Amino acid sequence: MQIFEQLTKNILKTNAQGYALFYYNNGFTLEKVNGKVSDLTSDDITFNTNFRLASVSKQFIAFSIVNLIKENKISYETNILSIYSDLPKYFENITIKNLLNHTSGIYDYEDMEHSDDDPQVQDKDILDFLKTTNDTYFKVGTKYKYSNTAYILLGLIVEKISKMSISEYIENNVFKKAGMLKSKVNIQGVTEIENRAYGHLLDEDNNLYVKDQYWCSATIGDGGLYSSINDLKKWCKYLVNTSNFTDMKASNYISDGEYNFYGLGIRTIEVDGNLIHYHCGDTIGTNTLLLFSIDLNLCLIFLTNLGGINTEIMKNNLIELIKGKI
């Protein structure tokens, strides 16, 4: 089986599926693009096409928080109530670190009452939602539960501590330093994104149709960044050479002894003694994967503007390739 076929096994659902793929391993490079930025246009996807990163965005939020920590403006142990005094009292037990590694137990904003006709929620709406809560799912720090709410709150903390908008902060303190000059933080209805891919779904006849937004796709902290293959290649090279990365890649043991392989915006696993760092993204009409390994001299980036694709499968396909099980 060829490498492309192995990596994309159970990932490509139709010949018209839009995607951009980059794979590098020890001098071998595979690059491939397919499809249109929108089913409504004739514009082809390229390596400069900007896709919504979905949860891959969390790396950039975490990186920004680590910046502020290294500048001694906050610490990993800063409790959230000391930043937002109008949040419920239980936030005095939740730290920056708990938000970063998903051990806070705060409620999922996706469980808010809503209808498809409601306006899209913004990050500030999630802060207001948290003010109405009175408990967590579990005792803080005792379990891992992936939390989009936590990363929205982290994005708001970046704004509050830096006294800059999240888009201004990331574009000046992360994107520019990494050379990612075409990447954007999307403020819905405001930001103009060049070369933008729009999300799609498949109908019952397996035909593409545009489905790019829904009620919770306008938030920033949990998934509102846009980038391309070419810019994400720059990000990988930049990230691994920063002191922030040392903090971000570290996994944790939580208080019940369970191993938490989620660091700070990055998941870390070990394959045959080699560390692999990655994050997947999943939102309406779009799925993403950013994966790299210093040990293996490897990088894999996959962006598709077709929803309903589990990019964890591609990560598992890669592991099979590494283990020689093909």
Predicted regions and their residues:
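Short, gly/Ser/Thr-rich active-site loops of penicillin-recognizing serine hydrolases
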Residues: 272, 307-326
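Structural recognition of the beta-strand scaffold that forms the well-ordered cores
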Residues: 20-22, 98-100, 299-303
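Short, conserved catalytic-motif segment at the N-terminal edge
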Residues: 2-51, 73-75, 132
